[in-house]
């Protein structure tokens, strides 16, 4: 399974779980960009233990180990951080079928304008 582009995202998957891997600034920008495309993510995943268990943009942040409990067929993971080289093998090893790069969805927007719209209350 290769890393997919946002253009490969199946809008029929809206009934499925959409999660964002990375709860930092890029993750928050991705969450806003998805919402502007009519896609609501359910939660964030982050490997930083200081973020886990907290909320950002009214969404819970879980650990990668917690993500393993999700339905690997119907969970769509948007990778919104710089650690592709470790996240992609983790997702493959745990049999996730649907994971995406976020660069092309962010290109659709003025990132500086999006940045001013995200919830910056939770800084790490």
Which residue stretches match the model-derived regions?
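Hydrophobic, well-ordered beta-alpha structural blocks that scaffold small-molecule cofactor pockets
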Residues: 1-124
